[in-house]
């Protein structure tokens, strides 16, 4: 393998991180987990590489139905939302709270994410959409609508594949329909 044939320590480290990424992208979850552990325990790993390794570990756990282990890693990773891995982890933890019906928890976590001052606006916007959904689930339709409008008015899409505005537009139409029906009754 590339790792065993590398002679210099730095080349071994590059090979190890490459093997982790390759296993993850190739959906070889067991190898991705094993490689991520090696990267996490290597003294040459900086905080960015460790965050990536934790992310790969969590996503690999999810892919192999090891949900509890995944969310333990995601909860830890979500403590630093300054980078893309921590921000996505925060969103996933928020979505999990929503899925469990823990709507007050959703609210607390979204506001904590916002207060952290992260520049990861995509994941923050997705988190606010989940917050709006949690208001709708509690039949707080005006609050849900205001949350979705806030995302719509304050979010700048990052490119043509960005789904935030489409998600918000669909939800706003639904809220307007529900509110209109309530006013008629």
Where are each of the predicted segments found?
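Acidic, polar-rich low-complexity tracts and alpha-helical solenoid repeat scaffolds
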Residues: 1-185
């Amino acid at each position: 393998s590339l790792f065993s044939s590398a002679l210099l320590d730095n080349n071994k480290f590059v090979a190890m991180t490459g093997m982790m990424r390759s296993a993850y992208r190739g959906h070889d979850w067991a190898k991705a987990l094993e490689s991520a552990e090696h990267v996490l325990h290597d003294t040459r790993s900086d905080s960015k590489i460790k965050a990536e390794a934790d992310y790969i570990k969590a996503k690999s756990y999810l892919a192999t139905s090891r949900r509890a282990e995944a969310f333990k890693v995601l909860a830890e990773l979500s403590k630093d939302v300054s980078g893309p891995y921590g921000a996505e982890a925060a969103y996933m933890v928020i979505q999990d709270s929503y899925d469990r019906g823990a709507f007050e928890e959703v609210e607390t976590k979204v506001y904590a994410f916002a207060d952290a001052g992260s520049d990861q606006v995509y994941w923050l916007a997705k988190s606010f959409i989940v917050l709006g959904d949690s208001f709708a689930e509690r039949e707080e339709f005006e609050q849900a609508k205001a949350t979705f409008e806030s995302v719509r008015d304050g979010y700048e899409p990052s490119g043509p594949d960005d789904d935030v505005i489409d998600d918000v537009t669909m939800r706003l139409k639904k809220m307007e329909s529900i509110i209109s029906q309530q006013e008629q009754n």
